């Protein structure tokens, strides 16, 4: 199963995340199938590749709870259903 989840990177205590598509059995920081966006919790900055995310969701990828919340804020699910 493909999951949309966060991949951690950055310095200690200055963490940022990449939103990636990965197999559910992969390690957290393993090689992703595709990088779909960026999330910085310290500044609440988010950059998303919306067409690629919509395609992955339509193909059956399951977002984790945190990624689901980020996508709901960006109103990505409205584009999936349209």
From Swiss-Prot:
It comes from the Bacteria. The keyword Membrane does not apply. Transmembrane segments: none annotated. One of its GO terms (biological process) is translation. GO terms for molecular function: structural constituent of ribosome. SUPFAM superfamilies: Ribosomal protein S16. Keywords: Ribonucleoprotein, Ribosomal protein. InterPro entries: Ribosomal_bS16, Ribosomal_bS16_CS, Ribosomal_bS16_dom_sf. This is Small ribosomal subunit protein bS16.
């Amino acid at each position: 199963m493909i999951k949309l989840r966060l991949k951690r990177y950055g310095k200690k205590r200055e963490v940022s995340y990449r939103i990636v598509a990965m197999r559910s059995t992969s390690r957290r920081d393993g090689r992703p199938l595709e990088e779909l966006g960026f999330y910085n919790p310290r500044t609440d900055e988010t950059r998303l590749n919306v067409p690629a995310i919509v395609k992955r969701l339509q193909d059956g990828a399951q977002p984790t709870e945190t990624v689901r919340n980020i996508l709901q804020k960006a109103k990505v699910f409205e584009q999936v259903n349209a």
